[in-house]
């Protein structure tokens, strides 16, 4: 847990350094970065594959879980637009254990920056939790509340706004990854177990937050 909170602190420091209240405050080097609603291939892939995805996973899910997935799908534009509205942070975009190197077994060095974007900083925390820890309510609440404390000390944001950012973040990159890999042909998968494992992990968050 100490190591996890250390990661959260370090990624928050990056988020806070590159925090942009509005479009005017963007520094020149960040102006070319895309926001979620400008990353067109996310929604294109989801729209093209959603029916196939539901068909493939329906036997693994209960009726309420399928309803949750369909509700997310039907509200993608709203979700993406809200997560693309300022204030925004410079985000890693694919934060998970394999993309973190620990210097001296303590200081995290973040690797693989190919998904960088402007987004809500907590989107990095959400993906880190899904990909890197076993689902545990106490740990999840500890991490999310700790990040909120760091954020609240620097910026004016209500807990309701923060929770909305968390829920939206659950429905963007994690949802994209889930639909993508669970609709992929088996012969294209390097790890045939990953899609189902990711689906099951993500559904635990959906069942908890929605």
Cite the ranges covered by each PLM segment.
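Active-site acidic catalytic loop and adjacent metal/ATP-binding pocket
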Residues: 74-121
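Protein kinase-like catalytic domain
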Residues: 15-19
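Short, charged/polar micro-motifs that form catalytic or ligand-binding hotspots
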Residues: 1-4, 85, 115, 130-137
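ATP-dependent phospho-/nucleotidyl transfer catalytic cores
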Residues: 1-10, 20-92, 201
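Eukaryote-biased recognition of C-terminal alpha-helical segments
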Residues: 192-200, 206, 210
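Active-site activation/catalytic loop segments of kinase-like enzymes and analogous catalytic loops
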Residues: 118-155, 171-192, 197
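Short helix/loop segment immediately N-terminal to the Walker
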Residues: 27, 84, 154-160
